[in-house]
Amino acid sequence: MSNSGRLVLRPWIRELILGSETLSSPQAGHLLKVLQDSETPGPSSAPDTPDTGAVLLVSDGTHSVRCVVTRNAIDTSDWEEKEFGFRGTEGRLLLLQACGLRIQVAQDYAPAEFYLQVDRFNLLPTEQPRVQVTGCNQDSDVQKKLNKCLEDHLSESASSSAGLTLSQLLDEVKEDGDHRGALVRLAESCLVLQGPFTARPLTHWATSCSQATEEAVFTVPSFLLHISENEEQILSSIDSSQKAQENPASPSLMPQEESGASVSLLSALPTSDPGQKDNSQPPPTVCSTSPRAQAPSSTPCSSTPSSPLLTCSPSLSPLRHAPTSYQACETRTQFHKLEFRELQWPIKRRQLLPRTGAQEPHSVWEPPERHRDTSAFQYKYGTPSASLHTQVQTARLSPQLVAWALNIVMESELPQV
């Protein structure tokens, strides 16, 4: 006790935690804060309701510790105001007579720490100003002891839970497997309501379809594979005309209707002028069918060395009904006429060879630089090669293809009924 009447506290909390862990004699502490006040059980409360008492923060002047006061300690104390609880008693001195050290394991948001469980105490009327001090669990030596105690606690809990051997665990797993198998068999027996089900055997088609999953399958509509009567008549007439053209007596004596059935894109017609034997052949002409009547005095195909390419476009009248064999021949005689139109395409003059003086075998065609409306081309094309020019000249359309195209065009022009 000092001259001013203030009681000087002696540090004892740290030594208690690191030493004996129990009080050998009563120790005085300063009540700093009431963390949880005690609740006096009333007559309406259940008899088995647990009561933890009060939770106080007590200091020895150097360190502070959390003290849990049991309900039994509160009931047996000589404190006269215990019915009102610890609220309002902050700053008073607390004499701890019996207490023990406990460890709180970390759970939820509460950290692991040491605390004191108070079994007997006495609250003194002396009151002093409160001074904040450091918690005892923040001391380095106390932290080391806390970690060691937690390791011992975990090892003890692990050893106590290891009561089953490996063989016992395997037996438990086997029993669970047998039980699960019995449940599966019971469920299968409940699901079979109409007896065993026999799957139908797979056909060869189903097996091939299941195996060829990565192959592409294409289908063709049946109406595209059907040949109508009109097409059969046209094909038969074309076959007869083709057989007659295989061994002709003379190209000049070929009938007009049979010569009109075969039309070439670029047909080269040589001339019989004896004065042109030493020169190269004249440029080819382009011939196509036309329904217009041609004058008897006009020549079928005539050309000169300086004449441009000739072409003509087909103009067909609609087909009214299916023609007979005689009418088909007459129709071909009437429709397959030739008409010529000039295309104003510039042709490069033939150049003489440097040594022999002969002309090139084929003229070189240069693509036009502008459209017919004098507008410039958007793209520039190169000059075609001589081999491509030769391939185009020798191209031929078969009579079957020409007749088929003629039939398609004529059918498309029929009026819709």
From Swiss-Prot:
Localization terms from the record: Nucleus; Chromosome, Telomere
Keywords of the record: Chromosome, DNA-binding, Isopeptide bond, Nucleus, Phosphoprotein, Telomere, Ubl conjugation
Motif window: PWI: 11-13
InterPro entries assigned: ACD, TPP1/Est3
GO biological process per UniProt: embryonic limb morphogenesis; establishment of protein localization to telomere; intracellular protein transport; negative regulation of telomere maintenance via telomerase; protection from non-homologous end joining at telomere; protein localization to chromosome, telomeric region; regulation of establishment of protein localization to telomere; segmentation
Gene3D superfamilies: 2.40.50.960
Residue stretches of biased makeup (Polar residues): 237-250, 259-292
Superkingdom assignment: Eukaryota
Residue(s) carrying Phosphoserine: 25, 313, 317
Subunit structure: Component of the shelterin complex (telosome) composed of TERF1, TERF2, TINF2, TERF2IP ACD and POT1. Forms heterodimers with POT1. Identified in a complex with POT1 and single-stranded telomeric DNA. Interacts with STN1 and TINF2.
Function: Component of the shelterin complex (telosome) that is involved in the regulation of telomere length and protection. Shelterin associates with arrays of double-stranded TTAGGG repeats added by telomerase and protects chromosome ends. Without its protective activity, telomeres are no longer hidden from the DNA damage surveillance and chromosome ends are inappropriately processed by DNA repair pathways. Promotes binding of POT1 to single-stranded telomeric DNA. Modulates the inhibitory effects of POT1 on telomere elongation.
Protein's name according to its UniProt entry: Adrenocortical dysplasia protein homolog
